[in-house]
Amino acid sequence: MKKAFIIGAGPAGLTAAGDLAKLGYKVTVYEALHVAGGVLMYGIPEFRLPKAIVQQEIDGLKKMGVDFECNMVIGKVLTIDELMGEYGYEAVFVGSGAGLPRFMGIPGESLKGVYSANEFLTRSNLMKAYLPTSKTPIRTGRKVAVVGGGNVAMDAARSALRLGAETVYIVYRRGMAELPARKEEVEHAEEEGIIFKTLCNPVEILPDEDGFVKAITCIEMELGEPDASGRRRPIEKKGSEFTMDVDTVIMSLGTSPNPLIRSTTPGLETNKHGCIVTEGDEGKTSREGVYAGGDAITGAATVIKAMGAGKAAAKAIDEYIQNK
């Protein structure tokens, strides 16, 4: 039986694993975290995607013969070269996602009560630590500021409400028309009472005497000419700073791929954003037998795009192995 392995048990990796298993391959999925599912399990809130549904899909793959190795950080525990050499795998699909959060680099980001959206959503989804007997509580305050305007920001804001926050703000440097989140996500957030503080940007997070967040200072913005993304560039209004009392700040400013795989795989081409470079839609990389897809090549995107990439790559991997 021909063997292939998958790095990452998120939507791209799970889709590729299922398609390869159907084609008769022995597939092993290596997952860095202790539960398979990736963003489906850790990132998307329970009220949007029940975890029992994700587990059903994973259990279905196991019945098809797919093996899952969790707590396996490829690039640290094992490398791609080792797996394709000593372990005898003929091809790999890299679906390791883009889980490295970005921060603003402003004063106060290291205070207690400041989270990345990734950490906040992971904690709120799991509500426990790696060891079943240990808890990793999430401290949600009464007043929460979520910085950013994408779908993940909406998820974080709505999760904070469900965890008991009295007031939740979305702080975004452009206007409502420029919000990158889907229209439906914005409407849901508005319906639930989340307050949108648009055309303003944080400049500092202020501490109390114990090192916890007590407030956030923002500056008003105005929109200038369009930038490279086609959206109008936000420009600071001098002297317009104001302070909001908050006790939790969640940074939802996008993510990038973890550098572990690219730094331990010689000859694997990446771009300036750290994303793996591929040819066409099939996910073929600069390394023979190495395919990639999902957020690992695009940066943070949608689940459906990641699944499509996994499907296309599985087909390409099959063609590659059959023609070897």
Please place each PLM-identified region on the residue numbering.
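Long hydrophobic segments that form regular secondary structure
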Residues: I138-R174, F242-T248, T255, G274, ...
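Beta1-alpha1 glycine-rich phosphate/pyrophosphate-binding loop at the start
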Residues: F5-I74, R102-E109, E119, A153-I205, ...
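A conserved FAD-binding loop/helix module that cradles the flavin
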Residues: A296-K324
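Active-site loop ensemble at the mouth of alpha/beta enzyme cores that anchors a bound cofactor
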Residues: G108, C200, K214-E222, K238
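FAD-site-proximal beta/loop scaffold in flavoenzymes
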Residues: S110-G141, P226-A300
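Glycine-rich beta-alpha junction loops
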Residues: G97-L100, R174-M176, E220-E222, P257
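A conserved short coil-to-beta-strand element within the FAD-binding core of flavoproteins
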Residues: C70-M84, L199-G211, M221-G224
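FAD-binding core/adjacent interface of flavoenzyme oxidoreductases
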Residues: M1-I7, L23, K51-V54, V66-K143, ...
